Amino acid sequence: MTSTPLDKIRNFSIVAHIDHGKSTLSDRLIQTTGGLTAREMSAQVLDNMDIEKERGITIKAQTVRLTYKAADGETYILNLMDTPGHVDFAYEVSRSLAACEGSILVVDASQGVEAQTLANVYQAIDNNHEIVPVLNKVDLPAADVDRVKAQIEDVIGLDASDAVECSAKTGVGIPEVLEAIVTRLPPPKGDPNAPLKALLVDAWYDAYLGVVVLVRIFDGSLKAGQQVRMMQTGATHRIDKVGVFTPKATDVEYLGPGEVGFFTASIKEVADAAVGDTITDEKKPTAEALKGFKEVVPVVFCGLFPVDAADFEDLRAAVGKLRLNDASFTYEMESSAALGFGFRCGFLGLLHLEIIQERLSREFDLDLIATAPSVVYKIKLRNGDEIELHNPADLPDVMQIEEIAEPWIKATIFTPDDYLGGVIKLCQDRRGMQRELSYVGSRAMVVYDLPLNEVVFDFYDRLKSISKGYASFDYQLEDYRAGDLVKMSILVNSEPVDALSMLVHRSRAESRGRGMCEKMKELIPQHMFVIPIQAAIGGRIIARETVRALRKDVTAKCYGGDASRKKKLLEKQKEGKKRMRQFGKVEIPQEAFIAALKMDED
């Protein structure tokens, strides 16, 4: 196979908000160009995971090489990078965009521009991409093409007069989309004779091949038998085989400049293939590395514990396997007095956390308890040291702390203006600070600064219920700001439960504490003695609920008569209960943990 001339290659990604039809459009492009036969075609070809198909979201970015005979009679190679639309997987988007020269912006003709449309388009603009707007779902009765074109021009500032109109579902307008890719997107640049310079876009683990590495070649060429070096890690590998996805893996002789493909080199761990690294030839290295990506840092942490302690080793094996495919997921062992052994895991956001939990229970058949999600706090100590806190239970003594800083985000929310009041109230309740408010037709766009701590709990669910599901939400991390944060502990029978401790803002502590205590009271079964459930900040109790004791009627045998006999029996019972309370252990059922952590705070 000879290398394709650069002017016959187009590398592009498809960016859009969730549910605007990216994956369906990808399916149509693959079908139209003959990437798969009609028999092999299935809905959402590029969404390999069951969870992706069920939730209708794309999690891992995928890549496909399409061969297209254009109207000018020439044959072009189109490399499509499918990207996720959800905010948690923004790092997947940034990787795909760095490997392309152009983007197709898909906007639902009935919904219009949404929050994540904006976030992803701005990423594409930052990468100096040529952008072709495509209006999808024009066959829907609710489609309003002119309104959406005006929105694209007003909100994003792109000229939408020649936007391509299509319906990925029915196949209308797909040939026009392919023509627009060829005529309006630029070809890649590159020198086939220069030393090899390739960008490592992604890596995943395959049971047979070991680690499969997805690359975009900028200069030089890559072929089997070549000795290559990773510039970031310094590791060297001998390439076993080189290929492309059509979307089936197909071996090729070599990859030239501008091409996107994969190679295997018996690399043992995905961690050895750092995403964003530059790959070059060991004998003839390139002088400078490519601009990589920002290091992905976990934003939300939570503890995962097996319901049955005997499953701990299975959980260890499962998180290890997930880490092979998802370098942004981190974990370390931790033990809790209440829940036993488990792992403290780091995620990119709440959806990421939910997906990993679901994959653990579905693919590895594990029953898990997740502790309350918390964010990373920066703590300045009196002696001048700074530490990062991942687990609220590990907070140092209050007397040593100078200040606690928490992460803040910039949240962009699009909502129909009927629900604007409720959305603003929600943001204000969560200590938000309004930055701007503007209208796009009948929809409002509000931008707020919010503490991430207030968002990770249940902000997204509340936003969806306030707006009847119409609001869309996107966020970027801004900075760390000092705040009046306190550690709230939950005590059951005067014993602190480490898995339920959390850092909260002082102004919210009382309501959060009361809610937790009420929830626990409903779920802890009655014992033979009274059980106080308390929320405390340091030594000060801020909320209390009591689980009443079960009581045996000890005076039932006394027929009539002597009051002192009854009194004696009651006193004896009282003494026994007092002793029981002193030495009795309260078993907290698993569902009490799960419910307390899922607590909604209306």
From Swiss-Prot:
InterPro entries: EF-4, EFG_III/V, EFG_V-like, EFTu-like_2, G_TR_CS, LepA_C_sf, LepA_CTD, LepA_IV. It catalyses: GTP + H2O = GDP + phosphate + H(+). GO terms for biological process: positive regulation of translation. GO terms for molecular function: GTP binding; GTPase activity; guanosine tetraphosphate binding; ribosome binding; translation elongation factor activity. It is a peripheral membrane protein. GTP binds at residues 19-24, 136-139. It is an enzyme of class 3 (hydrolase). Its EC number is 3.6.5.n1. SMART domains: EFG_C. One of its GO terms (cellular component) is plasma membrane. Residues 7-189 form the tr-type G domain. Keywords: Cell inner membrane, Cell membrane, GTP-binding, Hydrolase, Membrane, Nucleotide-binding, Protein biosynthesis. Required for accurate and efficient protein synthesis under certain stress conditions. May act as a fidelity factor of the translation reaction, by catalyzing a one-codon backward translocation of tRNAs on improperly translocated ribosomes. Back-translocation proceeds from a post-translocation (POST) complex to a pre-translocation (PRE) complex, thus giving elongation factor G a second chance to translocate the tRNAs correctly. Binds to ribosomes in a GTP-dependent manner. This is Elongation factor 4.
